[in-house]
Curated annotation (Swiss-Prot):
The lineage of its organism: Viruses, Viruses incertae sedis, Anelloviridae, Gyrovirus, Gyrovirus chickenanemia. Residues 1-43 are annotated as: DNA-binding. GO terms for cellular component: host cell; host cell nucleus; T=1 icosahedral viral capsid. It is found in: Host nucleus; Virion. GO terms for biological process: endocytosis involved in viral entry into host cell; viral penetration into host nucleus; virion attachment to host cell. The gene is VP1. InterPro entries: Capsid_protein (IPR007291). Homomultimer (Potential). Interacts with Rep; this interaction relocates Rep into the nucleus. GO terms for molecular function: DNA binding. This is Capsid protein.
Length: 449
């Protein structure tokens, strides 16, 4: 029994381990115990700029007849992209490809299942090394061996974007499916996922936790900003427009804000209506260009830019994102991680349960599993990540960039994310369908009793 002592002004002490310990009590301003917070850290101040859950209300819906809880736990490596040219000067662009240290992690059941699939050479690309079959193969054989993978449009286009976070993840699933490797040795399609959960037709998201740690320095100042958002309402419309077609995500345009000079009222006007991620398209000045052309650039070489856009480091910081400093810029502790927690469906309409497999579906096909019949790929939350630096291009808004290089036998991760997620499957069908007929007839076929 530890000895206790009380001093004036409410100071308590306890004697243990050979000395007196001061019990640091919280102020008794409230009836119950509350931790004192600084005013500028209050939730109301942060929600004035970005509200991750802009309102919800509960709706009384009938609970399913039976439920099953599914848990995911794993790690996600946010790595730098690689390029797979056949030679070092493929098309003249291989040595001039630059990427930004950005990522977008979508919380949906489809991508969590893809992240937990078998780690075999025929089922998962396995990180930033896209694989020689994808880089060199352009016939049907490559598509047969690598289903649901993006084939490069030419040999200087990366075959995977940072949105495909599950390619660089190792995820464990509980309960496990002992027959999954034999039934689905390749990447699972929506049809395969529907057959895997053929006995369940509802699902809901309970909770997902992220713990992000910056792992790579980029100059003397390189924190990683991360912001959790509801659904996809911070994603630009152009991302949704081209989300299903990776090959058309590249467009040829002008040099993106690198100091080009234009005259008169042509293109390249420096107004705020032009997205910095979507540079203008000035005409190329050649020897055959007609005289009197009003647009002149310091460099007449046009550049390629991608439709796949992400939030910059400055944008995330302005919205109140957390910062994680890499080792060397701050001592590693629990506070070195960015902690994010997402609960519920994140749906202002109060839709708690979502459709996994539509009722009355005897033969599960991809047409049934695609929206709106199935909501398997519905995004409940999105985690936006970007690394900043003190030296960056003006049009990148403080985001760290790097030159895409050819693959080596190692991956270069600039952030690591620990993930824990809980989902629940439900079924409103009766668990025992063995019914009896009201009447039976033993007469011959075609006659009536």
């Amino acid at each position: 029994m530890a000895r206790r002592a009380r001093r004036p002004r409410g100071r308590f002490y306890s004697f243990r381990r050979g000395r007196w310990h001061h019990l640091k009590r919280l102020r008794r301003r409230y009836k119950f115990r509350h931790r004192r917070r600084q005013r500028y850290r209050r939730r109301a101040f942060r929600k004035a700029f970005h509200n991750p859950r802009p309102g919800t209300y509960s709706v009384r819906l009938p609970n399913p007849q039976s439920t099953m809880t599914i848990r995911f736990q794993g790690v996600i490596f946010l790595t730098e992209g690689l390029i797979l040219p056949k030679n070092s000067t493929a098309g003249g662009y291989a040595d001039h490809m630059y990427g930004a240290r950005v990522a977008k992690i979508s919380v949906n059941l489809k991508e969590f299942l893809l992240a937990s699939m078998n780690l075999t050479y025929v089922s998962k690309i396995g990180g930033p090394i896209a694989g020689e079959l994808i880089a060199d193969g352009s016939k049907s054989q490559a598509a047969d061996n690598w289903p649901n993978c993006w084939l490069p449009l030419d040999n200087n286009v990366p075959s995977a974007t940072p949105s495909a976070w599950w390619r660089w993840a190792l995820m464990m699933m509980q309960p496990t499916d002992s027959c999954r490797f034999f039934n689905h040795p390749k990447q699972m399609t929506l049809q395969d996922m529907g057959r895997m959960f053929g006995g369940w037709h509802l699902f809901r998201h309970i909770e997902t936790r992220f713990q992000l740690l910056a792992t790579k320095n980029e100059g003397s100042f390189s924190p990683v900003a991360s912001l959790l958002s509801q659904g996809e309402y911070l994603t630009r419309r152009d991302d949704v427009k081209y989300s299903s077609d990776h090959q058309n995500r590249w467009q040829k345009g002008g040099q993106p804000m690198t100091g080009g000079i234009a005259y008169a009222t042509g293109k390249m006007r420096p107004d705020e209506q032009q997205y910095p991620a979507m540079p203008p398209d000035p005409p190329i000045i050649t020897a055959t260009t007609a005289q009197g052309t009003q647009v002149r650039c310091m460099n007449s070489t046009q550049a390629w830019w991608s439709w796949d856009t992400y939030m910059s480091f400055a944008t995330l910081t302005a919205l109140g994102a957390q910062w994680s400093f890499p080792p060397g810029q701050r001592s590693v502790s629990r506070r070195s991680f960015n902690h994010h927690k997402a609960r519920g469906a994140g749906d202002p309409k109060g839709q708690r349960w979502h459709t996994l497999v539509p009722l009355g579906t005897e033969t599960i096909t991809d047409s049934y599993m695609s929206a709106p019949a199935s909501e398997l790929d519905t995004n409940f939350f999105t985690l936006y990540v970007a690394q900043g630096t003190n030296k960056s291009q003006q049009y990148k808004f403080g985001t760290a960039t790097y030159a895409l290089k050819e693959p080596v036998m190692k991956s270069d991760a600039w952030a690591v994310v620990r993930v824990q997620s809980v989902w629940q499957l439900g079924n409103r069908q009766r668990p025992y369908p063995w019914d009896v007929n009201w009447a039976n007839s033993t007469m011959y076929w075609g006659t009536q009793p």
